[in-house]
Amino acid sequence: MRENTVISLHKFFWAAYVLALIVGSLVPVAISGAPEQSDKVVHFLAYALMAFFWPSSWRRSWLSEFCLAGGLGLLLEFGQGVLPTGRFLDPWDALANAVGAGVGAVAAFAWSRSARRNLFKSLRRKA
């Protein structure tokens, strides 16, 4: 498998993840039996993963990645408060989104580009 194909698959799966995140943020979900405020952990992890796996060809700096991922989280939280989706705006969810985006962006940059290239090379060899 060529490196361009691997990168294209990465972008495709990342875009599918973001689309699922958007839909999941706007569609009402009833979760019973979960501890109170446990959704903050889910928000944090969802946005950390989105920022961490941000396609490197679109990445300019950890700050721009944080602003875009965190901005999407804020926009979706605002949308929950404005749109008639049965969801409501929660500032703590917005904070968890932003913190997760920041941690994911910084973690992605801490993990060097060469490490990412080595991962793609190993994936390409296996394919």
Predicted stretch roles:
Residues 1-94, 98, 102-127:
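Bulky hydrophobic segments
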